[in-house]
Amino acid sequence: VKDIIDPKTPLLCLSKGLEVGSSLMMSEVIPEALERDQPLCVLSGPTFAVELMQGLPTGIVAASENEALARRVQSLYGSSCLRVNTSTDVVGVEMSGALKNVLAIAAGIVEGLELGNNAMAALVAQGCAEIRWLAGKLGAKSETLAGLSGTGDIMLTCFVNLSRNRTVGSRLGSGETLEEILGSMNQVAEGVATAGAVVQLARKHRVSLPVLTAVARILEGDVDPKDAVDQIMNLPQVPEVYTTIITIRKKKMPRILLILLIKIILITQKL
């Protein structure tokens, strides 16, 4: 393929996953396979193809290290029913798209086990934190993880029945085997292959991911879905994650000190 594609031709990547074995993102796999740097833009976000085909309002993200290329993709694909935001945070966009598929399987398992809405909310919240921990370790920006390709895609994939990954989880929770499920599906559920790669990546960077790791263990047949949920519920109780809030009374703090304090907090949150 590298002999056919011009080195200056931009490539558009729509894949959401990590390479099995290497745990590489597609933006890393493509230049490695081509044995050269290639202009690349990643297109990702909360999208079901059937709704795009129906012309329903949709928002996605075009991410490229080359900001001009991201804007070019934005101008090519943006329309009255498709809003395209741009980003230079390729890592954040790709990692969100890959990890949310694994979390969607977990959400489906909770649905299949009929554990209720409280459990669903708690699990997805924990999963969002785990995505933030690992993606942040790799350099993803917090605003990307909170945007369309992060929170937006998580909400769509975890809570809507059209999601293939959620469907796999739901059927696993209902008692079907993975072989039965995959054998009856005409489409690919990316989270199945990605789960193991996520665990491998987490180990490499020493990040604890209880929920996403549990999904990988369930898919590998190492643990029953109900037992996995019980194990997660019996993890040590921990403080809730919170954001620092500053209350400033008029004339109590010099402006320069306030600016310095805010900068310190922002730097701390990025560490």
Question: How does the language model describe each region?
Answer:
Residues 1-55, 73-75:
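Rossmann-like NAD(P)(H) cofactor-binding subdomain of soluble oxidoreductases
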Residues 4, 29-39, 57-144:
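Internal alpha-helical scaffold of NAD(P)-dependent oxidoreductase catalytic cores
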Residues 13, 38-44, 84-88, 147, ...:
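General beta-strand structural signal in soluble alpha/beta enzymes
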